[in-house]
């Protein structure tokens, strides 16, 4: 079993099985070293711990917090927070200091300012750890950490949904939707794919009434993707709510431009054979005919029309023509991040706009004819904290 402490402690909480609870405790007091799972066992199995076992496990959690203090990754900050919350009331002072360190100094002092200034401080693969932080803080302290960066969390469900490659991966236990990743290998990381789904399920559980959550719920409730493997099944059981109504993801937009962090995701339709483009973390990827191709937006010279959006590679293109059918948005990628540009459309009066933190510019072009566009960079790059100027 990949995560025996988590799985057995969860089973004990739900079923009351003393055998499962004792197995979780034995793992935690023995070879168990994963701080997150240790915290869950200590919290969920507290009523079957002897006094000696409780003290021993509390000491192990306290050591884990101290020994991991140099690791400031989001998953480890999550684990230390869970451990500190579990220890609260069992040890004096230290748990409260750790909670303050994670919530006030790290989240509010570092992560929120980074997100609001356009830095990608939360990686896609850390979405589940992020949601565990949100849940434990709200459940224990009645505080919603989303309030510090509302745009990031409003965009998160749709960014998460559109940043999956169109083709799914059939595994022995279930099918997987594969989240986009930098430096794609030959085989998908199915553990990462399972945690991606767990993160989506926990997003819905956190705020089931949010518009993005309702679409995400419709995306999740497909039996082919239920996590049935030994790693994923406990997460599915913990978070999935098949009785929660959702909206069909066919109603969701096929284009999402995250102007806060400078990311862009487009797919041509909802079929598994769809064409897909993703621009994130400075990398441009195309998915077509089941394969991912990485492109250099600074050297690519052609436009890409995915039926839902037109993408222009603008690093070397300062003058171009573009024809957008219907109401397709037009994006220029590969520009200088946070830089002011003069935009001249069909030799008419110029307007001014600013590229986002990823170097993406959303162009407002006429949709009834081919338009000639000229881009001219102007001025110095804007500061990271500057807001996007409207033309």
Task: Report residues per predicted region.
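Aromatic-lined, polymer-binding surfaces characteristic
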Residues: 1-158
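Context-gated lysine
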Residues: 55, 60, 78, 105, ...
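Extended polysaccharide-engagement surfaces of secreted carbohydrate-active enzymes
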Residues: 129-349, 353-367, 371-372
